[in-house]
Amino acid sequence: MRLFLLRHGIAEPGTSHLRDFDRALTPEGRAELDSIGRALRRLDVAPRLVLTSPLVRARQTAELVAPVLGATVELADELSSGATFDQFLSLVRRFTAEDALMLVGHEPDFSEAAAEWIGANGDALVVKKAGLIRIDLDDRHPGAHGRLRWLLTPRQLRLIGAGAELPIDSDDERGEA
């Protein structure tokens, strides 16, 4: 399975009058995700399903990207801020029949889970807002082992979305950039 981890876009700052759950994307965050959606299409990111954290900024991210990919969106409480690797693993294992799956959520949850999947230290990866990780999971051990294929920053994705030459081959089986 190709597993895509997309961190939510740029959101409003937290204030004493706004619950963390309710923080929405900023206009800048929405505009950036439009470009990133184009990049995902150019990279042949084509999951049928996008699972998202129920937090507003993650839901909005999923709702902006999914139509570009031709995917449907489902809420997954397991992706709420503070998710553990075991929660990620349990969630992904429910969808092992999928060729590709996208999760939209939060940091440091994504970088910690990705590091666990690829056998790296927990602080080995950092996913910026609107950044993307692709991990190819081992079909013999559904969800348990994976190989890092991409760690793309929002800047790289914006450039790809704007038509820049692809820095990676989306079908490269060796995972080399």
Show which residues each predicted segment covers:
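Active-site-proximal alpha-helix that buttresses catalytic centers in soluble enzyme cores
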Residues: R2-D77, G82-A83, F110, D123-V127, ...
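Generic beta-sheet signal
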Residues: L3, A97-G105
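Glycine-rich phosphate-binding loop signature in dinucleotide/nucleotide-binding domains
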Residues: L43-V45, R94-D99
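Short phosphate-binding loop-to-helix
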Residues: S80-A97
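Residues that scaffold the ATP/ADP-binding catalytic core of kinase and kinase-like folds
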Residues: A113
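Domain-level recognition of soluble alpha/beta enzyme cores
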Residues: I118-R147, L151-Q156
